[in-house]
């Protein structure tokens, strides 16, 4: 019985030590997303979850697939932005807008995504680079929809984000 208690304590200790704590001064957003890309007659659909941590010195955006597998992690500081994909390949740029443009052909920054999540009504942030963005707040549940044409892939893209701010 004593061995079982020790084993249970050890497992509990390991599980607790694996959780990532968010600092007090961090702003934390989590949620789900779906992306549909139409090119010609083919349609690609993807979905997953995200976690955005905003700290005074950096922003971290983790993007996961539908079953929690890592798709990419983006970390932006004042001087540089780094993306690490699921194959652990690293891509760097001067900021998140340049990085996302380099990867998928849309200059979309973490700051612009954060403005969408906060439901800020700045027309320049919401509708730029051929993205038409709308949001609706139904009983505290925000739904963001961005639609636009991506020249680099010659496709029409629709992005839907269902965010929530963590306490």
Label each region the model flagged:
Residues 1-8:
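Bacterial N-terminal signal peptides that target proteins for export
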Residues 14-17:
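C-terminal motif of bacterial Sec signal peptides marking the signal peptidase cleavage site
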Residues 19-22:
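Bacterial signal peptide processing site
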Residues 26-32, 56-60, 138-146:
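Short, hydrophobic/aromatic-rich segments at coil-to-beta transitions
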Residues 29-40, 83-84, 104:
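Charge-rich amphipathic alpha-helical interaction elements
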Residues 35-72:
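Post-signal-peptide N-terminal segment of Sec-exported extracytoplasmic proteins
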Residues 58-107:
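An acidic-aromatic
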Residues 94-167:
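Mature, soluble, non-transmembrane domains
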